[in-house]
Design a protein with these regions (language model features):
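Active-site lining segments that contact anionic ligands and/or coordinate catalytic metals
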Residues: 258, 274-276, 283, 308-312, ...
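Active-site bordering "gate/hinge" segments
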Residues: 1-258
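Short solvent-exposed loop/turn micro-motifs enriched in small/polar/acidic residues
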Residues: 209-211, 254, 270-273, 306, ...
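Short, glycine-/Ser/Thr-/acidic-enriched flexible segments
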Residues: 45-46, 115-117, 161, 223, ...
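Long, well-ordered mid-to-C-terminal structural blocks that present hydrophobic/aromatic surfaces
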Residues: 251-307
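Extended hydrophobic packing segments that form well-structured cores
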Residues: 365-410
Length: 410
């Protein structure tokens, strides 16, 4: 699938090297062992990066397991065609043994995002899309358990396409310049640069954890939201799980979220675009929602089990992020710096890695729920870049401003 611009081979080679060498590590910075099996999933629109990823995996002493996914192209919209012709039992089908075998086999997972058509599923009923997502939950559970046990490293990165650039109001070359800048690909050694950035955000996360924050109150023209955190939470940051990533995040106690937030960034999900989103929470549950576009998809997401509760609260310091405008892709939009950084929350599944302690592997979902860690097949990051202040209430009852005007203040 030919694009109007393809980055030079030297740059793609450097990008692939960054994805493998920096992306394949856990949140503690431990690198994946040589000889590991790395699965890399690449859409057809990103074929040039597939070539260099395979090479980088081999050069670093690992075993590549590539998955090449057809991109929607004119009459050959494979994704939409599945939903058009699949019966309910086919939408609900999951090849459990096959998926479990894949997860058991791999030590690392790389996913490349490259939309040939951000609206590929616009004609498909949202309910059917969510039905499919729900049916795949067992496969996600296999993967999640392996990640939580520290036995599976994963990362996500972006390959620019004409369709994505158009959606963001740029030429493809301009779009790629944003990727290059955000990932520091013009640096002599991007891996070294990212190791330095990672140390900075990890230090911020550790400081927040040491504060023993009980709750945060987010206030601004578009938000008045209080989220319970609790003493059994830690804050995490960066790592190689997303490239790029400047965010610092935790999992709130889903039962203790109250207030309102308007999200000024569009939300791209399931081949559709939600705009003008507003959410109202009472005792941890979304009790009211609005959207100026595709509200029916938002409603379907909220009706998915656990989809109406929060699994993540995140902040990005504007001083670190090189992303200055919307890229029409959540991976980048949740890391926007700009003038005021960004706040994003995630509807759906929590990060159990944010538990501050050593979890018992026998703990069931119900026990995690009792600890305030939400469970869901969805994890939908929704984003605001407007000016806001975040005030924390600490264990001793005192308050402290931890984030203001786009900067951490701790």
């Amino acid at each position: 699938m030919k694009q109007s611009y393809t980055p030079p081979a030297t740059l793609l080679e450097k990008y692939a090297d960054l994805i493998v060498r920096f992306g394949m590590q856990n949140k503690d910075g431990k690198k994946i062992k040589k000889g590991s099996v790395i699965q890399f999933t690449v859409p057809e629109a990103a074929k040039p990066l597939y070539f260099y990823l395979q090479r980088a995996i081999l050069k670093n002493g690992h075993h590549p397991m590539g998955i090449f996914v057809p991109s929607p192209d004119g009459q050959y919209n494979v994704q939409a065609d599945f939903y058009t012709h699949a019966a309910k039992k086919q939408v609900d089908f999951i090849a459990k043994k096959f998926i479990k075998g894949q997860v058991d086999q791999i030590d690392g997972s790389i996913q490349i995002l490259a939309e040939a058509d951000p609206h590929a599923l616009k004609s498909i009923e949202s309910k059917k899309i969510m039905q499919r997502a729900q049916s795949q939950n067992p496969g996600l559970s296999y993967r999640r358990r392996k990640i939580e046990s520290g036995k599976l490293d994963w990362t996500i990165a972006l390959y620019g396409t004409d369709a994505m650039a158009k959606e963001a109001g740029m030429t493809l070359k301009e779009y790629w310049q944003q990727i290059i800048k955000a990932c520091y690909l013009n640096d002599k050694d991007p891996v070294a640069t990212w190791n330095t950035i990672n140390k900075t955000v990890q230090t911020t996360a550790k400081k927040l954890t040491k504060l023993r924050i009980q709750s945060v109150h987010v206030v601004g023209s578009d938000v008045d939201l209080t989220l319970g955190i609790g003493s059994n939470r830690k804050w995490l940051a960066g790592g190689g799980c997303n490239i790029p990533s400047y965010e610092v995040f935790t999992t709130p106690n889903w039962t203790d979220v109250n207030g309102w937030i308007r999200l000024n960034q569009p939300h791209y999900r399931y081949g559709k675009k939600i705009e003008g989103m507003e959410l109202w929470f009472e005792s941890g549950v979304v009790v009211k929602s609005k959207a100026s576009k595709n509200h029916e998809l938002l409603e379907s997401m909220l009706k998915t089990p656990g989809g109406n509760k929060l699994g993540e609260f995140s902040l990005t310091d504007a001083r670190l992020s090189k992303i200055t405008k919307s890229m029409a892709e959540i991976l980048y939009d949740e890391n926007i710096g700009g003038t005021y950084g960004n706040t994003h929350i995630a509807l759906g599944s929590a990060y159990r890695e944010c538990y501050d302690g050593t979890p018992d592997p026998t703990w069931k979902t119900a026990y995690w729920e009792a600890l305030g860690f939400n469970s869901s097949v969805v994890h939908s990051d929704v984003i605001s870049t407007t000016k806001r202040t975040v005030t924390a209430t600490l264990e001793n009852g005192t308050t402290k401003v931890i984030y203001k005007d786009g900067h951490f203040s701790i």
